[in-house]
Amino acid sequence: MNRVPNNKKVIFLLSALCCLLLVGVNLYQQKTWRSMDLIIFMGQSNMSGAGGDTGEAPKLTEGAGYEYRAVTDPDTLHVLDEPFGEKENRGALDDTELLERKGSLVTSFVNAYYEQTGVPVVAVSASRGSSSLNGWLTKGLKEEAADRLNAAKDCMKKEKIHVYHTYMVWFQGEADANLETTDDEYKSQLAELVSYMKEQGVEKCFLIQLGPDLTDPAKHQTVMDAQLAACEENEDLILVSTLPAELTDADLRDELGIHYKQEALNLIGADAGKNAGAYVKEHGSEK
């Protein structure tokens, strides 16, 4: 009767043990990875939180979100805190001389989004005061935003965090209203920006509609209407809040009537986060 030599048995057993060990290590590594959604917050001064107040911002729901600080600490994640993006000034997105970031809508957005989806968010700051869409397309703003987004992905990978979904939130329009950007120009430029961000991995753009100018209600209307039309015509644009259009109480703005105070930012963020989360909950599997 033929028998397998003892040394071959040993080799066979060792090989089997190695295979089991590799499987076990792989399973362990899979279990230690977490999944989070990556969201980049883009726009101008009201996205930056120029009229906010950290002391009036909501507390973060435990486990709901983190901030990736591309400029000040690019090698790790921080628990989300206000003022969001406080010192994230660099290159084309450096607006240090224009405004101070005092408190944003981002924490309220993330809390509401997390309540809907149960998925934590890694938030990236990428806004600049007084920025028009043409500026985003021609002055290096979109490239700086892309660099920050891609750096966040690298950091998340290093931290063993799987990027489940990638989105952008857009809150902008005052600059284009001042420039008298036409309806067609605004829609075309916004579509170009979103298309560029999609090339960076963004799945959808969540849009917060611009609010009215309290001193001249007609001034912002063309851009406000263009934003609504763009969301109807472009499947990559998802309207998540029209609340700014309803917040016409002067007490909700700063003394210039331009920047929303923290009370308004909390309301806008919560509304947008809830609606964005509901969208992701329903359509999130449709990558």
Model-found features: residue ranges?
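N-terminal Sec-pathway targeting helices
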Residues: N2-A16
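Bacterial Sec-dependent signal peptides at the C-terminal "C-region" and cleavage site
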Residues: C18-S35
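A general, composition-driven signal for non-globular sequence regions
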Residues: N2-R3, V23, L256
